[in-house]
């Protein structure tokens, strides 16, 4: 998993357009 450099504590992952998903309050992609 690669961190997308974004947290998702209060808001969803804005980087989800790059297939990033919230996991442990941090956005990751495979």
From Swiss-Prot:
Disulfide pattern: 4-20, 8-22, 13-27
Position(s), cross-link Cyclopeptide (Lys-Asp): 1-30
Keyword Lyase tagged: no
PROSITE patterns hit by this protein: CYCLOTIDE (PS51052), CYCLOTIDE_BRACELET (PS60008)
UniProt keyword annotation of Oxidoreductase present: no
Function statement: Probably participates in a plant defense mechanism. Inhibits the cytopathic effects of the human immunodeficiency virus.
UniProt name for this protein: Circulin-E
Native source organism of the sequence: Chassalia parviflora
Lineage per the UniProt record: Eukaryota, Viridiplantae, Streptophyta, Embryophyta, Tracheophyta
